[in-house]
Amino acid sequence: MQRLKSFYLETIIPKLKEEFGYVNSYRVPKLKKIVINRGFDESCQNSKILEVLLNELEIISGQKPIISKAKKAIANFKLKEKMPVGMFLTLRSEKMYSFLDRLINLSLPRIRDFQGINKNCFDGSGNFSFGLSEQSMFPEINFDKMIKVQGLNITIVTTAETNQEAFFLLKELGIPFRD
């Protein structure tokens, strides 16, 4: 079992029950999934660059991403139908906890002048989204093989009903929030 998951089960669940007064264990908020999204511009239409970005996301997450394609052509954006516009993947269960553990303990501390993540990024339903400006902070990425600096968006979906519940859950899991 992942270290972060066992920490959640043994330590965080009792704290959440005490803090919010849950009687039923099934009402306690938990992580549902983590969605990693990466969009790209027209310079990434080159198949080599696209393949490198795909491999980077696969190395970071341990799972192969799905390429999202344009549904219709838009001339102003120089976009053709079925042209790749981004990639995403959804992590659940063990891979989700593994990725979150590596993100909190290895990747975020490697960001230069990191002050913490803005805590105003909740959506009102207990989900938390934030963006990272570059992929080089992940220890799995070889800086020499990196062709293009490309950011990614991470959404952490929880079963929490309010932002306060989700904030308490993520704070206890160890996500460094800005004060």
UniProtKB/Swiss-Prot annotation:
The family annotation for this protein states: Belongs to the universal ribosomal protein uL5 family.
Entry protein name = Large ribosomal subunit protein uL5c
Report whether Ubl conjugation shows up as a keyword of the record.
no
Q: How does it assemble?
A: Part of the 50S ribosomal subunit; contacts the 5S rRNA.
State the UniProt keywords alphabetically. Answer: Chloroplast, Plastid, Ribonucleoprotein, Ribosomal protein, RNA-binding, rRNA-binding
- What Pfam families does UniProt report for this protein, alphabetically? Ribosomal_L5, Ribosomal_L5_C
List the subcellular locations.
Plastid, Chloroplast
The GO molecular function terms of this record are: rRNA binding; structural constituent of ribosome
GO terms (BP aspect): translation
Tell me yes or no: is Nucleotide-binding among this UniProt entry's keywords: no
Q: Which GO terms describe its cellular component?
A: chloroplast; ribonucleoprotein complex; ribosome
InterPro entries xrefs: Ribosomal_uL5, Ribosomal_uL5_bac-type, Ribosomal_uL5_C, Ribosomal_uL5_CS, Ribosomal_uL5_dom_sf, Ribosomal_uL5_N
The residue stretches assigned to a coiled coil in this entry are none
Lineage, broadest ranks: Eukaryota, Discoba, Euglenozoa, Euglenida, Spirocuta
* Function according to Swiss-Prot or TrEMBL: Binds 5S rRNA, forms part of the central protuberance of the 50S subunit.
